[in-house]
Every structure is written in C-alpha cells, then in structure tokens.
Amino acid sequence: MFEHIKAAPADPILGLGEAFKSETRENKINLGIGVYKDAQGTTPIMHAVKEAEKRLFDKEKTKNYLTIDGIADYNEQTKALLFGKDSEVIQSNRARTVQSLGGTGALRIAAEFIKRQTKAQNVWISTPTWPNHNAIFNAVGMTIREYRYYDAERKALDWEHLLEDLSQASEGDVVLLHGCCHNPTGIDPTPEQWQELAALSAKNGWLPLFDFAYQGLANGLDEDAYGLRAFAANHKELLVASSFSKNFGLYNERVGAFTLVAENAEIASTSLTQVKSIIRTLYSNPASHGGATVATVLNDAQLRQEWENELTEMRERIKKMRHLFVQLLKEYGAEQDFSFIIEQNGMFSFSGLTGEQVDRLKNEFAIYAVRSGRINVAGITEDNIRYLCESIVKVL
C-alpha cells in the first residue's frame, strides 16, 4: 500500500534549517527559522525560566497526567496577560483558556472548533502570512479567502486594500489577525487602525481569530495587546491562539494556549466542553513542564520582574540590530533606502530582497533566508552583521 505514497514537499522554513545544519562554510548565517538569538548567536534559556525549573524540580512529586485543558493556573495567567487582569472579559468570566501544544496546536484547535461548532465556511487570511496558516485551515476543509496586507512599493501596510478586501467578508466569516509583530512583514496596524478594524468587525459580524505569538517583542506586553484588547472591548465572541515559545524562549516545550471569549459565562463553559472534546481526539492532554514553568514565573513577583526585564533586553537588542543593519547597508554602498526596516516590529523583516537575491546569498555567501525575502533580525549579531551587509550589497 505504501509504495504509492509520494513525498511531501519540504516545509519552506523548517527545510531551510535542515539545509543550514549541513552547511560547512564557517561564515554561515541563518536568518530563516524564527528563533531568538542573543548577542553571541545562541538561543539561551532565560534566567527566570531556569530558576523556575529549579523550583519545579525540587517540589515535583508526580508525573501523572494533566487534565484535558492543562494547568489551571497557567490558563488563568495566560488570560490575564492577554486581556489585562482587570478587563471586562475576565471580570465577567466570559473567557476560557486551554493549554495547547504551542501556537500551532492552538491554531489547529481553533480550526477544528470553528469547523465543527460554527457555520463559518470562510477564513480570511492576510497575504502574505505564515505559510502554516493556510495549511491548517485547508486541513479542516475551510475556504481560504485572502486580504491584501503588504504594499511592496511603499514597504508598508496596504491599509486601503486591506479595508477594501475585508469589506467583502460576510457575517460569520472568520478573520485571522496577527496580534503583533506580523509574520512575515513585521508591519502592524497603528492603534487608530486597530480601533477602526475592531469597529468594522463588530459592525459586519466577523468572528475574529488572533494569532498572538510574539507578545512583548514589539513594544511591550500591554502595548502589544492593544489590538486584541480593542476587539475584546466591543465583541461578544472572539478566539485567540497564543504562544510562549518566543517571549519565554520555550521553543521545544511547545507551550501555547487557545482562548475562547463568549457572550456570557454559561456559553463560554458550554463551548469549553466542545473544545475539550476536540483536544481528546487530537492529543488527550498537554505536557506539564513548559506550562508549569510559565505559571511559576508569572505567579512569582520577583521571577516575573526578571522575565520582563529579560524580555525588554531581547526587544531592545532586536531594535538595535535593525538600526545598525540599515546604517551599515548604507555605509557599504546600498543605493536603495532600507530605512523602512527600522519601522517594523519583532523578530522578522520583509527585507525587499528577491528570491534570486536570496538564492545568491545562500549559494555565494552561506547566508540562509526565506525566498520571500523574510529575514529573522534576531539572527543578526554584531559579529556577523558586517559580513551580512557587505554580502547583501553585492547581490543587490
């Protein structure tokens, strides 16, 4: 039976990482996969995380299964981080959160819930977007509709066409929004634009789904939640798929969450039973360690402050690299204006490089990036940035 199976295409991002591992040139640089790198080019374990793990090791008494929805304290802390602990959504008990297997797992739960429990047929996804968005919703049989997001000429948000496309979204359609640090462009709506989108959504009856994987890496924990909280303020229903992979550095622990907001507490609780039914058929229950680590940090004032300080350092290092990157490209003779990179948020930048230029960077200089031109700014260090900029100028 299996002899008829054809090979699946390699994932465009994860496949790049495999190619990078086999690269033998000493000056190689990986700007592809989305993990944070520190000034030394490593993906460190945060100090607050390591201390929390030590505490867990000392007090852990069992390896028993978690419940289907995961660690209750983790779920409560996640809601507070998303909406603010004093938000109406939390005070009225309209939100339910379950621990998931990373942000990807949360998105799959969302897709399954929408398909099984609502009448929604269409999901509107920005173009460009993270490639797995389309794959996840195709897997559950939903119809993908695209809305324009990026203006390639201006290297900016294509606001006019975004509104034009989303004005066609019907009542009950799902609209997928990147909460902050849009992947791959790094371009986010302004607070005023978020408010306009929230008003349009409420007026037209969309079901908003936020992919929120980078909270704290744009401008701050509360600042980055502005868009989500604007929607929560005027929507009876919305969904959130969030992750602690990036802002806690817990990539291989697969620590995510799916959050559902309903009109009232009773509907929220009933909906949660269906979410748990979905989880039971997918993976039964989540792993403990990552969620317990996050809950330990967020529950302890000292550890939480240390984590927030470390997160600020990460955010500021990325911003510093953006400025230095633009400065050195100019110094090395780039005729194009790359200043737009400074205005982008988070780990990623849509650099403006073409697929052919990206291929040359890999083949001639051992610099790996996604062919769309997306680069991981967090992969740039003071040790590799001059070689990087010099190489880019040579392929322009």
Curated annotation (Swiss-Prot):
Any Pfam family hit: Aminotran_1_2
Keywords assigned by UniProt, alphabetized: Aminotransferase, Cytoplasm, Pyridoxal phosphate, Transferase
One GO MF term: L-tyrosine-2-oxoglutarate transaminase activity
Cross-referenced PROSITE patterns: AA_TRANSFER_CLASS_1
Location of the protein in the cell: Cytoplasm
EC assignment: 2.6.1.1
Catalyzed reaction equations: L-aspartate + 2-oxoglutarate = oxaloacetate + L-glutamate
Transmembrane feature ranges: none
Top-level taxonomic group: Bacteria
Enzyme class: transferase
Residues reported to bind L-aspartate: 34, 130, 183, 374
GO CC list: cytosol
One GO term of the biological process aspect: L-phenylalanine biosynthetic process from chorismate via phenylpyruvate
Cofactor dependence: pyridoxal 5'-phosphate
Sites of N6-(pyridoxal phosphate)lysine modification: 246
PANTHER family, alphabetized: ASPARTATE AMINOTRANSFERASE, ASPARTATE AMINOTRANSFERASE, MITOCHONDRIAL
Complex and partners: Homodimer.
UniProt family annotation: Belongs to the class-I pyridoxal-phosphate-dependent aminotransferase family.
Protein name per UniProt: Aspartate aminotransferase
UniProt organism field: Haemophilus influenzae (strain ATCC 51907 / DSM 11121 / KW20 / Rd)
Taxonomic classification: Bacteria, Pseudomonadati, Pseudomonadota, Gammaproteobacteria, Pasteurellales
